[in-house]
């Protein structure tokens, strides 16, 4: 495979890891992700991953039912670490050296997040999985993905979802839903498309980091996306300058 990127960030939602299960982690899904990441890493592309925790706990949902929001968000951060360690194990079982770095210190389980160390791991060919979000309540893991991408100077964010791009309405509920091939950051916000939250979009725009949204459930899509094949929807980047 011919690589077009040097360093990328893959954003995985917690829900993506549970596959067809109603809760938790589907081992087959995690193993499939690990195999695809291994294929990409073998080409020399540097890969960092930010993983969510919604398959185990959702802070916003818990807060809506009376739990203190900050406390709920911290519990959600711990859930992301559970996913990160699971992903690390799956990657190492297929021969990919992997490090987990967390924004909240958990020295018995993972390294603390240190930007320079993360970059050094990437340069050595290791996959780095970021857990515990940004370490701050009230911020989503999408915002964490944008932040970490900017910090490690990733060229692009690949956001893995359950649909093949960004639509003007829910394609599961509306058969007439239209899929966008490309969007500007401004269009995402103006049309309220919820690709990522507004803070994440603002960070990507400020740092000119394109976002490619694609369907994780299709086997081979991680490789296709990272190798530059046209799939899903691209937000910002080259398409942003064309619309300005």
Curated annotation (Swiss-Prot):
Main location per the UniProt record: cytoplasm
Name of the molecule in the record: Uridylate kinase
Subcellular locations according to the entry: Cytoplasm
Biological processes per GO annotation: 'de novo' CTP biosynthetic process; UDP biosynthetic process
GO MF term (any one): UMP kinase activity
Pathway annotation: Pyrimidine metabolism; CTP biosynthesis via de novo pathway; UDP from UMP (UMPK route): step 1/1
Catalysed reactions, as listed in the record: UMP + ATP = UDP + ADP
Residue ranges of the region described as Involved in allosteric activation by GTP: 19-24
InterPro entries in alphabetical order: AceGlu_kinase-like_sf, Asp/Glu/Uridylate_kinase, Uridylate_kinase, Uridylate_kinase_bac
EC number: 2.7.4.22
UniProt keyword annotations, A-Z: Allosteric enzyme, ATP-binding, Cytoplasm, Kinase, Nucleotide-binding, Pyrimidine biosynthesis, Transferase
Positions annotated to bind UMP: 53, 73, 134-141
């Amino acid at each position: 495979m011919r690589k077009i990127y040097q360093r990328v960030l893959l954003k995985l939602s917690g829900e993506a890891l549970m596959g067809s299960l109603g809760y938790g982690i589907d081992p087959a899904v995690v193993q499939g992700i690990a195999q695809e990441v291994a294929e990409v890493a073998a080409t020399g592309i540097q890969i960092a991953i930010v993983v969510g925790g919604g398959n185990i706990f959702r802070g916003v949902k818990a807060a809506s039912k009376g739990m203190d929001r900050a406390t709920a968000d911290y519990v959600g951060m711990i859930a992301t670490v559970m996913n990160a360690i699971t992903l690390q194990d799956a990657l190492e079982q297929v021969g990919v050296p992997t490090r987990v770095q967390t924004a909240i210190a958990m020295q018995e389980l993972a390294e603390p997040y240190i930007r320079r160390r993360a970059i050094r791991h990437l340069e050595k060919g290791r996959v780095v999985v970021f857990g515990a979000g940004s370490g701050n309540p009230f911020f989503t893991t999408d915002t964490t993905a944008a932040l970490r991408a900017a910090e490690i100077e990733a060229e692009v964010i690949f956001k893995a979802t359950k649909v093949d791009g960004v639509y003007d309405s829910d394609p599961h509920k509306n058969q007439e839903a239209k899929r966008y091939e490309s969007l500007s950051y401004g269009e995402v916000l103006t049309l309220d498309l919820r690709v990522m939250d507004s803070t994440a979009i603002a960070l990507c725009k400020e740092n000119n980091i394109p976002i490619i949204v694609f369907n994780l459930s299709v086997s081979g899509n991680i490789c296709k996306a990272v190798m530059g094949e046209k799939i899903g929807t691209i937000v910002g980047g080259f398409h942003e300058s064309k619309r300005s």
